[in-house]
Amino acid sequence: MLNIVLLEPEIPANTGNIGRTCVATGSRLHLIEPLGFKINEKQLRRAGMDYWKDLDVSVYDNFADFLEKNPECQEKLYMATTKAKHVYTDVAFEEDAYIMFGKESAGIPEEILVEHEEFCVRIPMLENIRSLNLSNSVAIVLYEALRQQNFKQMQLLGELHRLHWKE
């Protein structure tokens, strides 16, 4: 199972969207405090729709608490940042990888990044853009990890509700 880690997320709608994406992909969500909202906030629930109840989510007091409670993540904790030297598509994500994203206003602190330099990845963008939306960034990197695993256990074919596809 892939793991999405949000370090101090600030915007409830982003976290709600990410929660919904985690449910849709069978991924676990890890939230590291302080959060910029309350878990029961209406905007968070609205963005996550009725999927929030199915979300596998854990909340941690801080980054050290997260590391202590997830010791297995040490060699597979990837950090998405605009400051990285490596592109996310150059990484071979493990089936149980942890992919961390920082808060919307500042990203992951540089003190953490330099300690995990070889695990830092970026999404390419034009140089005059500071960053992408957090929930979009999570979806981009998460779906690359899933693609590398051939979308294991995911429904690959869709079905029409009223009509049928031409064969």
Regions found by a protein language model. Name each.
Residues M1-E167:
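Post-transcriptional modification and biogenesis factors for structured RNAs
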